[in-house]
Amino acid sequence: MSILINSTTIGDIIIVSGSVLLLFILIKTFAWKQITGIFEAREQKIANDIDTAEQARQQAEAFATKREEELSNAKTEANQIIDNAKETGLAKGDQIISEAKTEADRLKEKAHQDIAQNKAEALADVKGEVADLTVLLAEKIMVSNLDKEAQSNLIDSYIKKLGDA
């Protein structure tokens, strides 16, 4: 029985080996191009997918870089706008201060002119009163012959009237 098993086993091995060899020959003859075509198509699809993914990654990186540049430019522009606003505000403040100083100087000069005019008018009024009092004093002195004491009293009262005026 062991010889029978051995010869059956060898026969089975030969038949199976022949069948496998025949199968490979048939596959090579009839289906090899389709099978390799499927593998090549699959390889090409994977390569295309990798290329597409690489392009998408590069586009995403370019987009991210562009957005970062735009953000940086926006920040720079915002800082410039803020700086310009500060400068404009300071210039406007300086202008307002300058205008206020000019107006204050103008008002001060006008006040000085008004004071000088009022002083001149007051002096003119005082001169008029002094002239009137002088004439009145001279008339009194001429009308009456006064002695020295009476003249002195008259002059003192004249000076007192000038002080009151």
UniProtKB/Swiss-Prot annotation:
Transmembrane region(s): 7-27
Compartment annotation: Cell membrane
Membrane protein topology class: Single-pass membrane protein
CDD domains per record: ATP-synt_Fo_b
InterPro entries associated with the record: ATP_synth_B-like_membr_sf (IPR028987), ATP_synth_b/b'su_bac/chlpt (IPR002146), ATP_synth_F0_bsu_bac (IPR005864), ATP_synthase_B_chain (IPR050059)
Keyword DNA-binding in annotation: no
One Pfam family matching this protein: ATP-synt_B
GO molecular function: proton-transporting ATP synthase activity, rotational mechanism; proton-transporting ATPase activity, rotational mechanism
Disulfide bridge map: none
Major site of localization recorded for this protein: membrane
Keyword annotations of the record: ATP synthesis, Cell membrane, CF(0), Hydrogen ion transport, Ion transport, Membrane, Transmembrane, Transmembrane helix, Transport
GO cellular component terms attached to this protein's record: plasma membrane; proton-transporting ATP synthase complex
Function, in words: F(1)F(0) ATP synthase produces ATP from ADP in the presence of a proton or sodium gradient. F-type ATPases consist of two structural domains, F(1) containing the extramembraneous catalytic core and F(0) containing the membrane proton channel, linked together by a central stalk and a peripheral stalk. During catalysis, ATP synthesis in the catalytic domain of F(1) is coupled via a rotary mechanism of the central stalk subunits to proton translocation. Component of the F(0) channel, it forms part of the peripheral stalk, linking F(1) to F(0).
Family stated for the protein in its record: Belongs to the ATPase B chain family.
Xref: PANTHER family: ATP SYNTHASE SUBUNIT B, ATP SYNTHASE SUBUNIT B', CHLOROPLASTIC
HAMAP family tied to this protein: ATP_synth_b_bprime
Subunit structure: F-type ATPases have 2 components, F(1) - the catalytic core - and F(0) - the membrane proton channel. F(1) has five subunits: alpha(3), beta(3), gamma(1), delta(1), epsilon(1). F(0) has three main subunits: a(1), b(2) and c(10-14). The alpha and beta chains form an alternating ring which encloses part of the gamma chain. F(1) is attached to F(0) by a central stalk formed by the gamma and epsilon chains, while a peripheral stalk is formed by the delta and b chains.
Protein name: ATP synthase subunit b
Lineage: Bacteria, Bacillati, Bacillota, Bacilli, Lactobacillales
